[in-house]
Amino acid sequence: MSGKPQSPENQARQLIVAYQQYQAEAESLVRELGLIQMTAEGLDKAISAIGALSKAAEGQEMLVPIGSGSFAYAKLSSADRVVVNVGGGVSIEKPAEEAMEMLRARRSAISESSKKINEALAKIEQEMARIQAALERLERELQKQGGSEGFVQ
């Protein structure tokens, strides 16, 4: 690389490319946050359901969700044991309290992941604001020179 300074146009191009990269990364993080939120909601529902089941009597008739807002009638055969997914498509039977603790631990981990992603997103947004300000300065500089129709949108 030579020692001479870059032209404002080249600086602007580089800043625009960097801005677009940050923007794509931010969009990806926002999508990831959406998935994390859905997972957290599912965990919250499971924890709540296990809590409600522990208060139900064996043999009690209840409505069980079967998907798409549809339910089936069922009788509770055991309130003290539930089947939980442990990952990799594997589900195991656990005591209800142990299952709740496992789900709470997952929920806590999900919350921590969400916090870290939000922190990363805030840093990206700060960088994007810094780049935007630099582009606006370059645009003003180019307009003073009379050589630009503008490039900041």
Swiss-Prot record:
It comes from Methanothrix thermoacetophila (strain DSM 6194 / JCM 14653 / NBRC 101360 / PT) (Methanosaeta thermophila). GO terms for biological process: protein folding. Belongs to the prefoldin subunit alpha family. The gene is pfdA. Its main location: cytoplasm. It is found in: Cytoplasm. Keywords: Chaperone, Cytoplasm. GO terms for cellular component: cytoplasm; prefoldin complex. InterPro entries: PFD_alpha_archaea, Prefoldin, Prefoldin_subunit_alpha. This is Prefoldin subunit alpha. Heterohexamer of two alpha and four beta subunits. It comes from the Archaea. GO terms for molecular function: unfolded protein binding.
